[in-house]
Amino acid sequence: MERKDRGKLFRMYVTEQFVQSIHMTTQDRRITKTRKAIYQAFLHLLNEKDYDIITVQEIIDRADVGRSTFYSHYESKELLLDELCQKLFHHLFERDDQLSPQDYLTHIFQHFKKNQDHVTSLLLSKNDYFIRQLKKELEHDVYPMVAKKLIQSHPNIPHSYLKHLVVTNFIETLTWWLKKGKTYTEQEVIQFYLEILNVASN
């Protein structure tokens, strides 16, 4: 094959790859836009009603997409809930090592308050999946911060019970505050919580 022909084939190959990359970029944008529309529709519906009574058809109608389009992105509304939990908890439980337990727990309360439009209904309705995921995060990130003092203060109490106490009390405290305790600041409520656990800093 002559050099001229090889050069022509190379230019054709480069052109084809460029066209394909543009097509993929456009397709990726379309996919991202569609997923965002579905996700936002889901959030808006959570602002209006409990998760359990939201239907896939309502999400489809609100997002203005076809049924086949919805199912090409999400197999069920449960996967939407899973994505919500992942996005929420990823930021929620990020921790700066310089933060004290009080400041870290205050950050969690503030984040729930900031996202309460689509989170409060899940929390207050005690959605099973949401609560299970929240408990896992609290066990992993919150309990270790207070475990040492608790175990020292209550050496005869099983660690599993202490962990259960920390996690369930946190959820109940957060629920109480979101429902009827907002006359108190996040910092004040966290102080109540830590004092009840007897691990507050002096």
Predicted regions and their residues:
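Amphipathic alpha-helical linker/stalk segments
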Residues: 44-48, 54, 84-108, 119-121
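Basic, helix-initiating cap at the start of DNA-binding domains
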Residues: 4-49, 58
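Helical hydrophobic small-molecule/effector-binding pocket
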Residues: 100-146
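Amphipathic alpha-helical packing segments from all-alpha helical-bundle domains
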Residues: 127-172
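Short hydrophobic/aromatic patch on the recognition helix
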Residues: 64-73, 170
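C-terminal peripheral helix-coil segments that are non-catalytic and often amphipathic
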Residues: 9, 13-18, 110, 176-202
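Short amphipathic alpha-helical segment with a characteristic S/N-K-E followed by hydrophobic residues
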Residues: 38, 53, 65, 76-81
